[in-house]
Amino acid sequence: ENNYLGKGISVNSNVTLNEESVKGIISVYNPNYKNSDKSVYTNVQSIETNRLAAFGYKTNKTGFEVGTDFEYLRNLNIGLSTNTFYEKIETDSSASSLQKKQEGDYLDTFIGLNIDYDKRNQKFQTSDGFRSMYSVDLPIISETNTLTNTYNYKYFTELYENNVSSFSIFLSSAVSLKDEDIKLSERIIL
C-alpha cells in the first residue's frame, strides 16, 4: 500500500523464498513525517538461512529497524538508523571447528549511517550524472563487533543519441573490531 489512510504512508509486507533462505518483512515508510521533509521508517523482519548442506550451519535472525532519512544539503541525503536482532546459529557435524564455536544465541544492536550524494539529471531513465552512496553499520551491542562498510558509485553518460552507458563500482567489507572471526551471518557472500 503506497497511500495508507490517504497520508502518503507506504506499508509493505513481503515474503521471499529461495533455495537456502526464507525472509519475511513488514515495513512502514512515511516520506514526510509531520510535514518535516524527513522520512521515517520502521520494519520488522525474520530471516532463516539454511546452509547445512553446503557449509554445515543454519541461522535464524529476527529483529527490527527504525530510521530516518533527510536532505542535509542540496543533492546530499543523510540517513540514520538503529537495528536490533536476536539470532540463533546452529551447526551440524559437517561444520568446521571455527563454525561450531559460533553456535549459540546472539543479540546485536547496530547504528547505521547512510550518505547519498545524487547528481543524476533525473531519477528515472537517467542519462547523465552520477550517484555516490556510502553506508556503515557500527556495532553498539555485539559479541563479535562486526563493522560493515559499503560503497556504491554509478556514473551515467549518453555516448550516442538515445544510447545511455553506465559504469558502476560496488565495494563492501566486514571487519571484526575485536580481531575475532566474523559471525557467519555477517560475512559477505558473493
Regions found by a protein language model. Name each.
Residues 1, 98-104, 108-190:
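C-terminal outer-membrane beta-barrel translocator/porin domains of Gram-negative envelope proteins
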Residues 1-133:
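Gram-negative/organellar outer-membrane beta-barrel architecture
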